[in-house]
From Swiss-Prot:
Membrane topology: Multi-pass membrane protein
Record note on quaternary structure: F-type ATPases have 2 components, CF(1) - the catalytic core - and CF(0) - the membrane proton channel. CF(1) has five subunits: alpha(3), beta(3), gamma(1), delta(1), epsilon(1). CF(0) has three main subunits: a(1), b(2) and c(9-12). The alpha and beta chains form an alternating ring which encloses part of the gamma chain. CF(1) is attached to CF(0) by a central stalk formed by the gamma and epsilon chains, while a peripheral stalk is formed by the delta and b chains.
Gene name tied to this protein: atpB
Annotated InterPro entries: ATP_syn_F0_a_bact/chloroplast (IPR045082), ATP_synth_F0_asu (IPR000568), ATP_synth_F0_asu_AS (IPR023011), F0_ATP_A_sf (IPR035908)
Protein location: Cell inner membrane
Designated name of the protein: ATP synthase subunit a
Gene Ontology cellular component annotations, sorted alphabetically: plasma membrane; proton-transporting ATP synthase complex
Lineage: Bacteria, Pseudomonadati, Thermodesulfobacteriota, Desulfobacteria, Desulfobacterales
């Protein structure tokens, strides 16, 4: 089901990229989210002052809040991977929220975006495991006793691959379902008269889904740091 009107799709059509505009909507709006976040970051970091401005204060509270929550899960040892975890959390939250603006499409409502984020988390999880344990990281997949290894190993492999599917479909399913409801309401009531309760619910869902993705990612990272038993 298509959004009734997508501003940047129309822009790309006007520039002569009709095929790309219709087949890569999620890519276009991922670029929009990236541009928005980069602009916000540049504006916030341009004039850092001892007495913070409103923008600086907002960014400091947001970033420090996410970081301290993550450290409460991973411990101080996990602070170094906050830039990746925090970036994923903020990117997903903004990607979810942007779909509430008439004429915009949430990139997370396309399965490609959640899948890409999930693959990044999957790869980085095992990077952490290898970084902390080296070749001994394989023990995470072999179980507590050696003679159960032939049984435990394939189960662990399937479990880790299932994490990608879990992260992907949880985020995609919720955002696609909400987007479909919004599309119907926009068509029935007009782009600027969608019922406010649904919009409020959309804001709640956007933050909850970003938080769940972030929390699960951090838990996977923390698990990779732990020693196998």
């Amino acid at each position: 089901m298509e959004h009734p009107y997508l501003f940047f799709v129309k822009l790309f059509e006007a520039l002569g990229f009709e095929h790309f505009a219709h087949t890569s909507v999620h890519i276009i709006y991922t670029w929009v989210v990236m541009a928005l976040l980069i602009t916000l970051g540049v504006l916030g970091a341009r004039n850092i002052q001892i007495v913070p401005t409103k923008m600086q204060n907002f960014l400091e509270v947001l970033i420090s809040g996410i970081e301290e929550f993550m450290v409460s899960v991973t411990g101080e040892e996990g602070r170094w991977f906050f830039p990746l975890a925090g970036t994923i959390a903020i990117f997903i939250a903004v990607s979810n929220l942007i779909g509430l603006v008439p004429g915009f499409f949430p990139p997370t409502a396309s399965i490609n975006t959640p899948l890409a984020c999930a693959i990044v988390v999957f790869v980085f999880t095992h990077f952490i495991g290898i970084k902390y344990h080296g070749p001994k990281y394989i023990k995470h997949f072999l179980g507590p006793v050696w003679w159960l290894a032939p049984l435990i190993f394939p189960i662990e492999i399937i479990g880790h691959l299932a994490r990608v599917l879990s992260l992907t479909f949880r985020l995609f399913g919720n955002m696609m379902g909400h987007e479909s409801v919004l599309v119907i309401l926009f068509m029935l009531g007009g782009a600027f008269f969608a019922p406010l309760p649904i919009m409020a619910l959309g804001i709640f869902v956007a933050f909850v889904q970003a938080f769940v993705f972030f929390l699960l990612s951090v838990m996977y990272f923390a698990g990779a740091m732990e020693h196998a038993h």
